[in-house]
Amino acid sequence: METAKHFGSKLRKTLAALLATMALMAVLLPGALAVDLNVDVGFYFKQSRGGTCTLASAAMMLRRRAYLDGMDSWVDVTENGIKSTAWSGGLSHSFTYNDMHVGYATLPSGKAAKTEALVSILAEHPEGIVLYDRTRPHAVLLTDYTNGVFYCSDPSNGVASGRVPLSAASISIGGASCYCCL
């Protein structure tokens, strides 16, 4: 009888340990498997010619979304590759590329309102957004807002490559007026 009691106690402890391990995995595993889009694995590039900053920024945004969705063809998303559906003398305000629909919207006025709106938009769009500054005129891929800093990839050849603080880019939040996103 003593052996059955011991076995039951040991079984309960083993099951409790197993359940605790599974609970811990459920909490930690999603973070471990999450894709870090802030690590450049080839998302970013410079515009191929003058006047195509919006097209290049849109291609980088689509590339990041395709990567995030696990599409092997994300590397094939290029400025020239999206041009036939996304370009009409400028970036189209609405287009679809490989089942990814891009739309256009305007930002509120005032730097504080723009900042608040962009933080919220980026939280919903980890692939980033195409941010356009009509005062320049120029566009960048706004990628994230981390530790109080906006980051972007500026397709202009006069700015460092890759993900850089928006303050190092050729546009500003204050001058931004509109954006495109998925």
What are these regions (language model features)?
Residues 3-18:
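Bacterial N-terminal signal peptides that target proteins for export
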Residues 10, 55, 180-182:
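Residue-level detector of bioactive/disordered segments in secreted/extracellular proteins
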Residues 36-44, 59-182:
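Conserved active-site-adjacent core of cysteine acyl-enzyme catalytic domains
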Residues 47-56, 112:
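Soluble non-cytosolic domains of exported or imported proteins
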